Design a protein with these regions (language model features):
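Charged DNA-binding/catalytic regions of mobile-element recombinases
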Residues: 1-164
Length: 164
């Protein structure tokens, strides 16, 4: 756990016509969302607040993202290196290289967001959207079982493999 991570930024529409930007980091070993931050702007502050939630890997870790401007920024790259991660970037314009976190974003929206909010009438404030995201991450990590994890939740799976 904690050695191979993927990250991306997705966004949710707000009632005032703006966006809630959501930065997430997923552990490829456990499936757990290990970092999450929201912002009214897609900027370096969002990316850095997300990184600040990470623990350094026990051995050299890999941190994979797309080639978005947040991730190619030297400040971001330096912070990753300082944390003990080697940076890995998707091929330009190839979303399939980051499919695991892209898939999570889609799952979050389909399971949690779209059923609760009519697409024709986005009625979320930024605070509502931030709360919504944190609730889903908690649900996903602690309650949502996954077949590939032996029908355990990501947190149960992490506990199981770290006890052995």
């Amino acid at each position: 756990p904690g050695e191979k991570l993927v990250s991306d930024v997705t966004y949710l529409p707000l009632k005032d016509g703006s966006w809630c930007y959501v930065s997430l980091v997923k552990d490829l070993c456990t499936g757990e969302i290990v970092a999450c931050a929201t912002s009214k702007s897609q900027n370096m502050d969002l990316a850095m607040r997300t990184l600040e939630q990470l623990r350094a890997p026990l051995t050299q870790g890999v941190f994979h993202t797309d080639q978005g401007y947040l991730y190619t920024n030297p400040v971001f790259s330096h912070k990753l290196k300082k944390l003990g991660f080697t940076q890995s970037l998707s091929r330009k314009g190839n979303c399939l290289d980051n499919a695991v976190i892209e898939s999570f974003n889609g799952t979050m929206k389909c399971e949690w967001f779209y059923p609760r909010y009519n697409k024709a009438r986005w009625d979320l404030s930024f605070d509502d959207a931030s709360t919504f995201v944190m609730e889903y991450v908690k649900y996903y990590n602690e309650e949502r079982i996954q077949k590939k994890l032996g029908y355990l939740t990501p947190i149960e799976y992490r506990r199981q493999i770290t006890q052995n």
